[in-house]
Each structure stands twice: as structure tokens, then as C-alpha cells.
Design a protein with these regions (language model features):
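Helical scaffold of the NTase/Pol beta-like nucleotidyltransferase catalytic core
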Residues: 1-41
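Alpha-helix boundary/N-cap detector
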Residues: 5, 9-20, 73, 77, ...
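Charged/polar, solvent-exposed surface patches and flexible loops
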Residues: 16, 20-27, 31, 80, ...
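Short glycine-rich, low-complexity/disordered patches
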Residues: 24-42, 91-108, 189-202, 212-216
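Active-site nucleotide-donor binding segment shared across nucleotidyl transfer reactions
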Residues: 29-60, 64-73
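Conserved catalytic core of two-metal-ion nucleotidyltransferases
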Residues: 29-33, 79-132
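Predominantly extracellular/lumenal beta-strand repeat domains
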Residues: 47-49, 65, 80, 98, ...
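Right-hand nucleic-acid polymerase module
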Residues: 114-216
Length: 216
């Protein structure tokens, strides 16, 4: 079962290293491919939602949000540019190339040689926000030949950032943490691996936001 990672020093070291890698990725995308992007951990900021399943490796789930690009519809080119840029950065840190999965780019598992030696990896989901405030994930469907690349709208994602901000302002973020943990474990126990961390996060924020009339 999932639980929140409590080792604050380890969390700080892990987030610092991976944050540097993500910053370098955004810089490389701009310099090499003229693509504007920003990044954030799912859950964002100091109140992130980093979970660990028992003693298994930790996945740091990042959204790489594309903010500027010449052709939004060439999804294959976008995925390839991000993959190539990510590999350039990973090699600079002595990491192996990333793996291209359906909805993310995943790194190898790493660990620190001193202190907490728990293994961790990075999962990067490429996203964009449309003019109506909906979020879309870049999907690489490998089941078809030729492979299909497309933007897939995340269900119920409209204005999710504003909803999360409202919840934090009302100091009810603990409710989101509770919901997120419950949802992740619910899908885990039912062997449902089709719901990414971002989808679970959207579900948690909406559940809490929609129950705001019942807040104490």
C-alpha cells in the first residue's frame, strides 16, 4: 500500500537533484528546439504528493507543460524533441537514456550513496493547457502500426490549478492529501494501472473542491 514519504532530508535532496535536471531539460528544449516549457511536481510546490509503495522505489511524477511551440499538432515531433533533449541532460548527469512509455518518459532507478539509499526514478508527463483551461496529455499509442501520437484531454481537468489554489487558500490541503492517498491505494488494490498520478491528482482535487460546502 502507498504511504507518504516522511524523510524530509531525503525528499529535499531528491527534489533538488531532479529539479535541477528538469530545469536543464527546459533550457535544452529552448536552446535546441525553440520549445517553451515549464515543469512542476504533481501536487506542486512545498505541499507535494510524493508516495512510496511499501519499500519499493519512489516515482517522482513531473508534468512538463508545453507553453510555446510552432506546431501544436505534430505530437510525434514534440515527443521526440522532448525525449532527445531529456537524454542530452540525463547523460550530463551520468544517467542512462529515458524509456518512452505510453504517457510519459521514465528514467532509470537511482539512489544516493550516502544517507537514505531508497531508489527513485523520474516520470515525465508532457501536458498542455487549452484556452478553456482543460489539460491534455501527450499520448504515444504503440499498439497501432504505425504508432499514433495525440493529445488526450484529461477528464475533469478544467481549471484544476485554480481549484487547487482555492483549496490551499482555505487551508484544506490536508483533505487533498487524504483523497489522493485513498485514490492511489484504491486503484492499486484493484490492479488498475490505467490511472496516472496526474489523473489521480485531478480526481482528488475535484473531490475536495466539490465538497467545499461541507467544510468545517
Amino acid at each position: 500500500m502507498y504511504k507518504y514519504v516522511e524523510d524530509k532530508l531525503f525528499l529535499s535532496r531528491m527534489r533538488s537533484l531532479c529539479g535541477e535536471i528538469m530545469q536543464d531539460l527546459c533550457h535544452t528544449l529552448k536552446e535546441e528546439y525553440d520549445i517553451g516549457a515549464s515543469f512542476y511536481l504533481v501536487g506542486s510546490g512545498a505541499r507535494n504528493l510524493i508516495l512510496q509503495n511499501a519499500n519499493r522505489p519512489i516515482d517522482l511524477d513531473y508534468n512538463l507543460e508545453i507553453t510555446r511551440i510552432d506546431d501544436w499538432e505534430d505530437c510525434k515531433e514534440i515527443k521526440e524533441c522532448v525525449r532527445k533533449a531529456f537524454n542530452i541532460v540525463l547523460r550530463e548527469y551520468g544517467w542512462s537514456d529515458c524509456q518512452d512509455s505510453t504517457s510519459s518518459l521514465t528514467t532509470e532507478k537511482r539512489h544516493f550513496n550516502q544517507g537514505n539509499s531508497t531508489e527513485f526514478s523520474m516520470d515525465i508527463c508532457i501536458v498542455c493547457e487549452d484556452t478553456d483551461g482543460n489539460y491534455h496529455r501527450l499520448i504515444h499509442d504503440k499498439r497501432r502500426f504505425p504508432n499514433r501520437y495525440f493529445w488526450n484531454q484529461a477528464p475533469n481537468s478544467r481549471n484544476i490549478r485554480e481549484k487547487a489554489k482555492y483549496i490551499k487558500e482555505k487551508e484544506k490541503w490536508t483533505l487533498v492529501r487524504e483523497q489522493y492517498l485513498r485514490i492511489k491505494n484504491q486503484y492499486l488494490t484493484s490492479n488498475d494501472y490505467n490511472h496516472s498520478s496526474f489523473i489521480c491528482y485531478i480526481e482528488a482535487v475535484n473531490n475536495v473542491y466539490n465538497s467545499r460546502k461541507h467544510w468545517n
